[in-house]
């Protein structure tokens, strides 16, 4: 199998007939490197996940820490799956941002953890866009 054929196979991960996630890609600037990249908004990732796994579950736990909140998200293909039977897991921490005082650090941490967990489960633009 050629490299191009293998790439096409990778692009079929979590394929849903009639849905093209690349159409929803937005540009953002990486906070660490300043590099402009493309990503999917978390709401689109969640919608894609629901299309692929209608009975799926996204579990989030948030813990307050010193000057921030730490969120852990796990993605399950079925709401019936046991705690350790998840597709992917991610954590994120966020504190107050003086430049955006109206942004809740708790919600920001939750959203970041969910987005990374979904990306780790294959609901992202890791293979193109």
Regions found by a protein language model. Name each.
Residues 46-129:
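Positively charged, aromatic-enriched nucleic acid-contacting surfaces
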């Amino acid at each position: 199998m050629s490299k191009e054929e293998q790439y096409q196979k990778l692009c079929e991960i979590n394929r849903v007939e009639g849905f093209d996630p690349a159409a929803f890609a937005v540009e953002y600037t990486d906070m660490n490197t300043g590099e402009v990249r493309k990503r999917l908004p978390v709401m689109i990732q969640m919608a894609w996940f629901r299309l692929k796994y209608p009975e799926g579950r996204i579990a989030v736990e948030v813990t307050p820490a010193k000057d921030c909140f730490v969120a852990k998200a796990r993605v399950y293909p079925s709401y019936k799956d046991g705690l350790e039977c998840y597709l992917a897991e991610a954590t994120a921490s966020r504190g107050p941002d003086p430049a955006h005082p109206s942004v809740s650090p708790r919600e920001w941490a939750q959203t970041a953890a969910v987005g990374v967990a979904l990306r780790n489960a294959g609901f992202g633009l890791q293979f193109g866009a």
